[in-house]
Curated annotation (Swiss-Prot):
<dbReference type="InterPro" id="IPR037229">
    <property type="entry name" value="Ribosomal_bL35_sf"/>
</dbReference>
<dbReference type="GO" id="GO:0022625">
    <property type="term" value="C:cytosolic large ribosomal subunit"/>
</dbReference>
<keyword id="KW-0687">Ribonucleoprotein</keyword>
<dbReference type="GO" id="GO:0003735">
    <property type="term" value="F:structural constituent of ribosome"/>
</dbReference>
<dbReference type="Pfam" id="PF01632">
    <property type="entry name" value="Ribosomal_L35p"/>
</dbReference>
<dbReference type="GO" id="GO:0006412">
    <property type="term" value="P:translation"/>
</dbReference>
<dbReference type="InterPro" id="IPR001706">
    <property type="entry name" value="Ribosomal_bL35"/>
</dbReference>
<comment type="similarity">
    <text>Belongs to the bacterial ribosomal protein bL35 family.</text>
</comment>
<keyword id="KW-0689">Ribosomal protein</keyword>
<dbReference type="InterPro" id="IPR021137">
    <property type="entry name" value="Ribosomal_bL35-like"/>
</dbReference>
<protein>
    <recommendedName>
        <fullName>Large ribosomal subunit protein bL35</fullName>
    </recommendedName>
</protein>
<feature type="region of interest" description="Disordered">
    <location>
        <begin position="1"/>
        <end position="64"/>
    </location>
</feature>
Amino acid sequence: MPKNKTNSGAKKRFRVTGSGKIMHKRAHQTHKFEERSRSSVRRLSNDAEVSSADRKSIKKLLGK
């Protein structure tokens, strides 16, 4: 049986950690940082874990 191709868009947006979690970048990080509190800017800079509802479909896109 042939291997599944990895979805090009998904491989640019998600990464799998060593423990198996799927992480993604947070939104709203392009401009207008002077309007936001420092704490919200700092919070946005951290990666977030993908929700459990989306985990299965994203793993499929990544070919895992």
